[in-house]
Amino acid sequence: MRLISVTIIVFCLALPGAATAYGQQVGADLTRGQALVTKQCASCHAVGRTGASRHETAPAFRTLSQRYEIEALEEALAEGLSSGHPDMPEFVFEADDVGAIIAYLNSIQDR
């Protein structure tokens, strides 16, 4: 019985630290994802919660969930994102960057 009590106390003491670490990681992913899309995509797309895209046919990233399931974009980002549009360059991102981009895209969607 004493072992169970000690285990519960240790778990309860560790839980806030784990939540803080998780929150910091999520925040870091959002910041990195925002930086990546700003660098690679903002010359044509609106990449934030507001604003118009600079290229008239480039969708604002905050509206992507109206066309696509955001998580479904992971494979395209990792294997090479390309469209039939001649102005759209092909991009390939590393796995960690893909996760950060997806996290950022999810955070800005108009819902």
Feature annotation, model-predicted:
Residues 33, 38-47, 101:
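The canonical Cys-X-X-Cys-His
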Residues 45, 106-109:
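Protein kinase-like catalytic domain
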Residues 53-58:
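Short cysteine/histidine-rich zinc-coordinating motifs and their immediately flanking basic loops
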Residues 17-36:
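Electrostatic cytochrome c docking/interface patches
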Residues 1-3:
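N-terminal secretory signal peptides that target proteins for export/translocation
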Residues 60-106:
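Extracytoplasmic electron-transfer domains, predominantly the class I c-type cytochrome c fold
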Residues 5-17:
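Bacterial N-terminal signal peptides
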Residues 50-51, 70:
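Short, non-ligating residues that shape and space the ligands of small metal-coordination modules
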